[in-house]
Amino acid sequence: MGTFVISKRFDDFYKFVFTSRKGKTIFTSPSMELKMECEHHIEAIKANVEKYTYVKARAASGKYFFKMMLNDTVIATSRKYTTALLLEKGINEIIRTAVKSDVLDFTLNEFMFPD
């Protein structure tokens, strides 16, 4: 089962990632000003995962990735995959497990290596 992880970036914005059961990041959200925006997006994904579209693309390096979209808005961008088959497996993991995935909140953790 996958997991949503909310964390705080160094610039004080928030993001969330969806990780596979093995702990590998499948996608990362754009930066968000408020933590509740992350929570809202996660709940929307869990409630309506079938309504999202996955726009597949190829990076200049030749690796595959996708953008998770809803109504022409990018909700998240995937990690890079070496093959189209692995990309499909990543998308299927979201569709299969997002609904029952846990949400972990790491926003209160201090940075290990502050400036």
What are these regions (language model features)?
Residues T83-D115:
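Terminal recognition/anchoring or ligand-binding modules at protein termini
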Residues F27, E37, A59, K63-F66, ...:
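Short, surface-exposed, charged/polar-biased interaction segments
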Residues T25, M32-Y54, E93-L104:
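A low-complexity, Ser/Thr/Gly/Pro-enriched, surface-exposed linker/loop concept
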Residues T3-I26, A57-I75:
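Short aromatic-glycine-(Arg/Gly/Cys) micro-motifs in beta-strand/loop hairpins
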Residues G23-L34, T73-T83:
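A short, exposed loop/beta-hairpin motif centered on an aromatic-Gly-Thr core
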Residues A44-R96:
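Short, solvent-exposed interaction modules
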